[in-house]
Every structure is written in C-alpha cells, then in structure tokens.
C-alpha cells in the first residue's frame, strides 16, 4: 500500500490568537484559530498544527481552550506544540482533544521526556520538532552534508526559536529521538524558514533517509513546485506551510491537485 503524502497548515498562536496575519476572504475573524483551522479542514488538509508562541507560560488555559474548541469542531488530526515541558503538560493538551504533542527545546534539555511521553501516551502522540541551522565549521563526529553549491556543512540543532546552538548534530539527534520513541520528526531549517525559496532539501533528505519514522518538512515554501520537491528530492512524508496558506496564495486543495497531477499520492 502506498502511503499518501500529507499537507499540513501550521498556525502560530499568541494568547490564543493567530499571528502572521491572514487574508482569507469571508472569515469573520481572521485571528481565530478554530475558524481558520475549519477553513483548512474544508480545503482537505490532512492535519493542522497549532504552535503556541506565547512568551509567558503562566496561562496554559488559553491554549487548552483553543484545543478543546478545535477538537469539538474539527474531524482531522490536531498537533499542538509550544511550551510543553512536562508529562503533565502533555496530558492536559491530549486530554483537551489534541491527537499529538510536539516537543522541541524541552526534549533537547531532557531527552527522557520523549521516552516517558511515548511510554505514557504511545509513540503516535509524540512529535519531536527539530530546528536546525547550517554550521560550516568542520567538527568530528558530525554528519557532513554537501549542499547544492558544492559546499559542505553539518546541521546543528538550535533551540529557543533558533537563537541557541546546542552542538548537537541534527541527523544524530533525529535518530536518537526515534530510538527514544518519537513517532514523527518535524524538521525546520532556520536558513529556509520564511524565505519562500523552498525547503532545505539536503537536510530534509538526510534525515528522511536515516530515520524510519515520518519526517515533516517545514520552512521555506513559496511555490507549488516546492511542495513537490519536498516529497521527491527531500523524501519527506509530509509538508508543512504557514504563510502561503494564511495569505491565500494557494488553498490546500490546489496544492493537492497539483501534486496529484504530478504523480504524488495524496488524499483528495
């Protein structure tokens, strides 16, 4: 059986509202995540990611409320990330109706969180988000990756929104995450993110070819071709995008029809 490739819109939330403006015609409230997610649901999205980027962690109630409302109204898988630091945080988000939780900096700080979460809730619930940046300084034990221009680098895992290097090799960290029980890797290249010049293919392919769990490519989509490249050259199992969907440049359905026309198996 051929597994279909997934298209996943991502919504960044701050204080329960969508940030990164939206230009959807006919939305009463472009800042309401549930209304926006419902629109993507109607367009045939395979799942939706809510990323809580609220700086303060005192009030988890807001995101819990959003997740509950979304889970009540949507019939598609929902992944929630941002500020999930403990098993208790995971439990609250999953109990509110999320299908998966995405952990990032907290997993780097304490890799046991991956195994504990997988043990408690099942590997299918645990997404490890890996943010990476190119590092051109040669270092022993790092996975060398050749770029399109012939330069060689390794990819370093970064945390705290890309501001903090960890010294961890991205391919090695993705492998460890899988071994510890992650069910999926959400891979974002800091170089590509926001550029609209396409996914960072070299690292996407390197991770996809190394791990046995699904890899979601994220960061850099600007054209329909970029989705195609993510699946074919990047070997990704899913492609995630934000602004191209929020600004109405394409609908999820347009992306899927384009991909189907080029022989990529998608759920239409």
Curated annotation (Swiss-Prot):
Gene Ontology process terms (BP): L-histidine biosynthetic process
Gene3D superfamilies reported in the protein's UniProt record: Aldolase class I
InterPro entries hit by this protein: Aldolase_TIM, His_biosynth, HisF, IGPS_HisA/HisF, RibuloseP-bd_barrel
Annotated S-S bridges: none
Active site: 12, 131
Entry keyword annotation includes rRNA-binding: no
Primary site of residence: cytoplasm
Catalytic activity: 5-[(5-phospho-1-deoxy-D-ribulos-1-ylimino)methylamino]-1-(5-phospho-beta-D-ribosyl)imidazole-4-carboxamide + L-glutamine = D-erythro-1-(imidazol-4-yl)glycerol 3-phosphate + 5-amino-1-(5-phospho-beta-D-ribosyl)imidazole-4-carboxamide + L-glutamate + H(+)
GO CC entries: cytoplasm
Domain of life: Archaea
Subcellular location: Cytoplasm
Alphabetically ordered keywords of this record: Amino-acid biosynthesis, Cytoplasm, Histidine biosynthesis, Lyase
EC number: 4.3.2.10
Pathway: Amino-acid biosynthesis; L-histidine biosynthesis; L-histidine from 5-phospho-alpha-D-ribose 1-diphosphate: step 5/9
UniProt GO MF annotations: imidazoleglycerol-phosphate synthase activity; lyase activity
Keyword Amino-acid biosynthesis part of the UniProt annotation: yes
Family: Belongs to the HisA/HisF family.
UniProt function note: IGPS catalyzes the conversion of PRFAR and glutamine to IGP, AICAR and glutamate. The HisF subunit catalyzes the cyclization activity that produces IGP and AICAR from PRFAR using the ammonia provided by the HisH subunit.
Binding partners and assembly: Heterodimer of HisH and HisF.
PANTHER family assigned: IMIDAZOLE GLYCEROL PHOSPHATE SYNTHASE HISHF (PTHR21235:SF2), IMIDAZOLE GLYCEROL PHOSPHATE SYNTHASE SUBUNIT HISF/H IGP SYNTHASE SUBUNIT HISF/H (PTHR21235)
Name of the protein: Imidazole glycerol phosphate synthase subunit HisF
Organism: Methanoculleus marisnigri (strain ATCC 35101 / DSM 1498 / JR1)
Gene name linked to the record: hisF
């Amino acid at each position: 059986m051929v597994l279909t490739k997934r298209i996943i819109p991502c919504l960044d939330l701050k204080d329960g509202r969508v940030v990164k403006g939206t230009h959807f015609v006919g939305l009463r409230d472009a800042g309401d995540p549930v209304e926006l997610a419902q629109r993507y649901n109607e367009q045939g999205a395979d799942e939706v990611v809510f990323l809580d980027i609220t700086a303060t962690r005192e009030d988890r109630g807001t995101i819990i409320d959003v997740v509950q409302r979304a889970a009540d109204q949507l019939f598609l898988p929902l992944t929630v990330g941002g500020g999930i630091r403990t098993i208790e945080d995971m439990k609250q988000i999953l109990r509110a109706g999320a299908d998966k939780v995405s952990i990032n900096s907290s997993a780097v700080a304490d890799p046991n969180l991956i195994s504990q979460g997988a043990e408690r809730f099942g590997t299918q619930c645990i997404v490890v988000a890996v943010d990476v940046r190119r590092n051109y300084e040669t270092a022993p034990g790092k996975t060398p990756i050749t770029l399109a221009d012939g330069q060689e680098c390794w990819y370093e895992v970064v945390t705290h929104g890309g501001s903090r290097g960890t010294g961890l090799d991205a391919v090695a960290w993705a492998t460890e995450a899988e071994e510890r029980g992650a069910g999926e890797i959400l891979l974002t290249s800091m170089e590509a993110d926001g550029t609209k010049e396409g996914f960072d293919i070299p690292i996407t392919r390197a991770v996809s070819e190394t791990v046995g769990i699904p890899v979601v490519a994220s960061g850099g989509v600007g054209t329909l071709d970029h989705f195609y490249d993510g699946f074919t050259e990047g070997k990704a199992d899913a492609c995630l995008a934000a602004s191209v969907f929020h600004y109405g440049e394409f609908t999820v359905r347009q992306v899927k029809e384009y991909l189907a026309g080029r022989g990529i198996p998608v759920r239409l």
